[in-house]
Design a protein with these regions (language model features):
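Helix-turn-helix
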Residues: 1-20, 24
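A short, mixed-charge helix-start or loop-turn motif at secondary-structure junctions
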Residues: 15, 39, 79-83, 109-112, ...
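Hydrophobic alpha-helical connector segments
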Residues: 24, 28, 38-64, 116-123
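Generic hydrophobic, amphipathic alpha-helix propensity
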Residues: 25-29, 33, 97
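Residue-level signature of the cytosolic catalytic core of signaling kinases
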Residues: 42-46, 62, 78, 112, ...
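All-alpha amphipathic helical-bundle segments outside canonical DNA-binding/catalytic cores
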Residues: 48, 85-90, 106-122, 142-145
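C-terminal peripheral helix-coil segments that are non-catalytic and often amphipathic
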Residues: 51-52, 56-59, 95, 99-107, ...
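Short secondary-structure transition hinges
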Residues: 58-98, 109
Length: 159
């Protein structure tokens, strides 16, 4: 509550508790994907689109989400018995990934021996790995630069 800069009354008016606030970060990430989706050409190489989405999302996270808040989001997701927004496949994040990966398979740009849902899960896992490591290291390096170097290797197996 103190970190949010609001009174207890205002905080609990908008959020049921700390978990709800932290969960809202996942939907902030969805807003970024909603902003990016119209910029993606139907003709674009789907692997390159996946790299683009990752680069843009992680740049936004690095520039606008406090690493301690992100760390709390991840720790809450590990211990909560309630909703887990990071795994909610109804989110824009998962829907857009599914759409891009499906198109990539149809165009033979991505492998076809894995299911779309398995590939989406793998992509999300790789992205979380980058974010989790950045949180573990308390943001001591540029997340976007690290992703630029490592993410192509991580998801290269989807081709």
């Amino acid at each position: 509550i103190e970190e949010s800069g609001t009174s207890k009354g205002s905080f609990y008016h908008y959020f049921e508790g700390k978990d709800a606030l932290l969960g809202s970060l996942a939907y902030m990430m969805d807003e970024k994907y909603e902003e990016l989706e119209p910029t993606i050409s139907e003709d674009a190489d789907c692997y390159e689109v996946l790299l683009y989405l990752n680069r843009e999302l992680l740049t936004m996270i690095e520039e606008s989400i406090n690493v301690e808040l992100l760390t709390r989001l991840y720790s809450t997701q590990l211990t909560t018995h309630g909703e887990r927004p990071l795994l909610d496949h109804g989110r824009t994040y998962y829907k857009l990934l599914k759409k891009i990966i499906s198109r990539g398979r149809e165009k033979k740009e991505l492998r076809t021996d894995m299911s779309v849902s398995e590939m989406v899960r793998y992509y999300a896992m790789c992205e979380r790995a980058l974010l989790y490591e950045w949180c573990l290291r308390k943001g001591e390096y540029s997340l976007s630069e690290e992703a630029e170097r490592k993410f192509p290797m991580m998801i290269g197996s989807l081709k």
